[in-house]
């Protein structure tokens, strides 16, 4: 699962985006579901809401948005089949958080590229009649290199898989050819529990943190 992430726009690895010079985004160290964040759609950065409410859902007040979608479900569940066929996107991500229970307390960990490079997660998006756009992050089984904290992970795409994800290939071919072998490029470490509160948003959240025993 991916319930929080960090994004700092990197001009270098977004050079393929058409509207980069006109786009302004402040670093966000604690992005939570329902936040408005940039997503790459048709080679442009578009402000989208993280979390999708199925259009058949009449009452959203008692429901939570789908901010993650399992890769394994893309060809199985009607909720996702249409978007998987024609509405795939890239989610720029500088790192993400996962939690693990240690000594009866949930300890947050931060995951990032070993070379501090920005990454792209696979995503799906839905355009609403009111002009807003919602998206979900695709998750997969966490690679063995990082699965000690959580058994799920965002599906991080390398350059080849980015091309496949955005291609016009048929969905079955895309599903079969996407690489899930990204674990060697990821490192993780404990961070402060201050990240538990989505109102906290500062660089200290992504710094390695070890409590000093008394």
At which residue positions do the language-model features occur?
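Short linear sequence motif anchored by a di-proline
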Residues: 1-214
